[in-house]
């Protein structure tokens, strides 16, 4: 086990559990939903490897279905758009560089605190002077098996429920 800590504060930011398959079975590729059961297995594996910590886990979904209510051109960047995206309980402002984003689409939103399959942590940011509170995701960024190598976000079917957790499809 490697414990990742903030250098200045010593706050624990994450763990790297080597050979995790010895402690738990993960059926999914790409996004893995952390359930209370999975958190218990992770805590037990950490304890078995000498890491005496308590896990404080937020079980709210971090990858959700969103509805692009508005899209406007970014005032300081030709290839960026400012989107207002309804994610169920709130509407988020998200700056997006995908060429195919349009108002009226249902999309996958990585909310603040999401960890992409690549390891990228989603946090609030500012892109060319405009605040952004999440990310609209492509199939490739979500590590969906067989995802096409095309530019742009993943546009979902119209029957996808806004605010519901997005789960990686299995073929």
Where are these regions (language model features)?
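Phosphate-backbone binding interfaces of nucleic-acid-interacting proteins
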Residues: 1-171
């Amino acid at each position: 086990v490697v414990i990742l800590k903030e250098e200045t504060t010593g706050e624990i930011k994450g763990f790297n559990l080597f050979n995790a398959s010895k402690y738990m079975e993960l059926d999914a590729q790409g996004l893995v939903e952390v359930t209370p059961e999975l958190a218990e297995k992770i805590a037990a594996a950490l304890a078995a490897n000498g890491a005496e910590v308590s896990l404080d886990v937020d079980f709210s979904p971090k990858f959700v279905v969103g509805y692009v209510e508005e899209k406007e051109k970014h005032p300081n960047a030709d290839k960026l758009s400012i989107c207002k995206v309804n994610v169920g309980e709130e509407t988020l402002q998200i700056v997006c560089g995908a060429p195919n984003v349009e108002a009226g689409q249902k999309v996958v939103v990585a909310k603040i605190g999401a960890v992409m399959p690549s390891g990228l942590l989603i946090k609030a940011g500012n892109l060319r002077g405009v605040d952004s509170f999440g990310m609209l995701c492509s199939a490739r960024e979500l590590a969906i098996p067989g995802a096409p190598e095309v530019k742009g976000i993943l546009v979902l079917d119209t029957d996808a429920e806004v605010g519901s957790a997005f789960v990686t499809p299995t073929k």
